[in-house]
Amino acid sequence: MMADREVVLTAQGLKKLEDELELLKTVRRKEIAERIKQAIAFGDISENSEYDEAKNEQAQVEDRINKLETMLRKAVIIDEEDINTDIVSIGSIVQVNDLEFDEIVEYTIVGSTEADPYELKISNESPVGRALLGTKVGDVVEVQIPDGVTKYEILKITR
């Protein structure tokens, strides 16, 4: 993650990060501390794979906690009420027609932290997200994708 970049989030994305942080700090830390305690009880920790595994997991959890805390400090929350439905922006829900396959798809444009292609939440920094930003209903955009170029017609913009 970039050191000085702001993290753009929707309210839903903010809640997801806060929930993950809470889980890591309350539940996961305790679980790992208990595993370390049990591994130490086995005796010599110099060749104790359970201890090594728990310590590695502890380091990963602490690293994730630090990253989440940094993201939350740098968070800029997109207020749903401020989302302009005349043009595509972060937080917009955009219905497009993929002109190559004549298929209608609905994307939500989010900051990179929230992106989840399986939920059709695409990053404003992705090729499709960048191409859609600033467009209006009726616009047709060309997007460079791994297989070449595809065209999308903007059908609807909501929030």
UniProtKB/Swiss-Prot annotation:
- Print the keywords alphabetically: Coiled coil, DNA-binding, Transcription, Transcription regulation
Any one Pfam family here would be: GreA_GreB
Q: What is this protein called?
A: Transcription elongation factor GreA
Gene3D superfamilies named among the record's database cross-references: Transcription elongation factor, GreA/GreB, C-terminal domain (3.10.50.30), Transcription elongation factor, GreA/GreB, N-terminal domain (1.10.287.180)
PANTHER family in the record: TRANSCRIPTION ELONGATION FACTOR GREA
Q: Which residues form a coiled coil?
A: 5-77
UniProt keyword Transcription regulation present: yes
